[in-house]
Amino acid sequence: MATKIRLARAGAKKKPFYQVVVADERCKRDGRFIENVGTYDPNQNPAVFKLEEGKTLEWLGKGAQPTDTVKQILKKAGIWEKFVSKLA
């Protein structure tokens, strides 16, 4: 089972709010997911994100692939650098 770390949309019309989730890549964007690892609110200025670092690093270690947008969020949070340094 190939897993992705991606954004699942929530919130009202014209006011998106996203959950950062780990899901099977075959599932729908807002469908079934394995685990919720954080949130992302682009409506705030600057955009606010909260990630559970331990869970995120665990799933990256298991081979979950982040989408491009989630990878940028992980870089801003400093989690991506920690993951890359563990690999080296």
Swiss-Prot record:
InterPro entries assigned to the protein according to its UniProt record, in alphabetical order: Ribosomal_bS16, Ribosomal_bS16_CS, Ribosomal_bS16_dom_sf
Protein name: Small ribosomal subunit protein bS16
GO biological process: translation
Any Pfam family hit: Ribosomal_S16
Entry superkingdom: Bacteria
GO terms of molecular function: structural constituent of ribosome
GO cellular component: cytoplasm; small ribosomal subunit
Protein keywords: Ribonucleoprotein, Ribosomal protein
Family: Belongs to the bacterial ribosomal protein bS16 family.
